[in-house]
Curated annotation (Swiss-Prot):
CC per GO annotation: anchoring junction; cell junction; cytoplasm; cytosol; early endosome; endosome membrane; extracellular exosome; glutamatergic synapse
Binding site for GTP: 10-18, 29-35, 60, 116-119
Catalytic activity: GTP + H2O = GDP + phosphate + H(+)
Chief location category: membrane
Entries under SMART domains matching the protein: RAB (SM00175), RAN (SM00176), RAS (SM00173), RHO (SM00174)
Regulation: Activated by guanine nucleotide-exchange factors (GEF) EPAC and EPAC2 in a cAMP-dependent manner, and GFR.
Motif Effector region in this chain: 32-40
Keyword rRNA-binding: no
Quaternary structure and interacting proteins, as annotated: Found in a complex, at least composed of ITGB1BP1, KRIT1 and RAP1A. Interacts (active GTP-bound form preferentially) with KRIT1 (via C-terminus FERM domain); the interaction does not induce the opening conformation of KRIT1. Found in a complex composed of CDH1, RAP1A and PKP3; PKP3 acts as a scaffold protein within the complex, the complex is required for CDH1 localization to mature desmosome cell junctions. In its GTP-bound form interacts with PLCE1 and RADIL. Interacts with SGSM1, SGSM2 and SGSM3. Interacts (via GTP-bound active form) with RAPGEF2 (via Ras-associating domain).
Molecular-function annotations in GO: G protein activity; GDP binding; GTP binding; GTPase activity; guanyl-nucleotide exchange factor activity; protein-containing complex binding; small GTPase binding
Keyword Zinc found: no
Protein name: Ras-related protein Rap-1A
Tree of life domain: Eukaryota
């Protein structure tokens, strides 16, 4: 079974832990202590293939920056999350993406831009078009709006990253060994 190392990044309070826990455990937790770093494992089936996802739920971008290079180096796919209710969380993502590309030393990094808390439409300050435009600027990066609370597009975030990783590094099908018979 193939393993995937996925990293959830973004400013504090955007709902990184809520999205991760909703995906892994199927529950929405209203109150959290700020995350330092949590790791979760979940086996899923994506496109008829069993996958083991290791998801790293990280601290907000403004905290524990020393650890960030390490999990960027080890991660295979990245969810960059902002809250549609806070413009500053959206603005923070450009630097975060640039740091990922610098650490990975490539532009071709499986990544998805996630506008979280789309259930709070009446508190929206970041328009959907802003997210779509930023994703286009980022070499047509994948983009979704989500809600951990309302279970909107939660699974899709992680499944999309798995598909991107598979496109970048396809699973090699094991060829059956040819059996040979030697007659003496």
């Amino acid at each position: 079974m193939r393993e995937y190392k996925l990293v959830v990044l973004g400013s504090g309070g955007v709902g990184k832990s809520a999205l991760t826990v909703q995906f892994v455990q199927g529950i929405f937790v209203e109150k959290y202590d700020p995350t330092i770093e949590d790791s979760y494992r979940k086996q899923v089936e994506v496109d008829c293939q069993q996958c083991m996802l290791e998801i790293l739920d990280t601290a907000g971008t403004e905290q524990f920056t020393a650890m960030r290079d390490l999990y960027m180096k080890n991660g295979q796919g990245f969810a960059l999350v902002y809250s549609i209710t806070a413009q500053s969380t959206f603005n923070d993502l450009q630097d975060l993406r640039e740091q990922i590309l610098r650490v990975k030393d490539t532009e071709d990094v499986p990544m998805i831009l996630v506008g979280n808390k789309c259930d709070l439409e009446d508190e929206r300050v970041v328009g959907k078009e802003q997210g779509q435009n930023l994703a286009r600027q980022w070499c047509n990066c994948a983009f979704l709006e989500s809600s951990a609370k309302s279970k909107i597009n939660v699974n899709e975030i992680f499944y999309d990253l798995v598909r991107q990783i598979n496109r970048k590094t396809p699973v090699e099908k094991k060829k059956p060994k040819k059996k040979s018979c030697l007659l003496l």
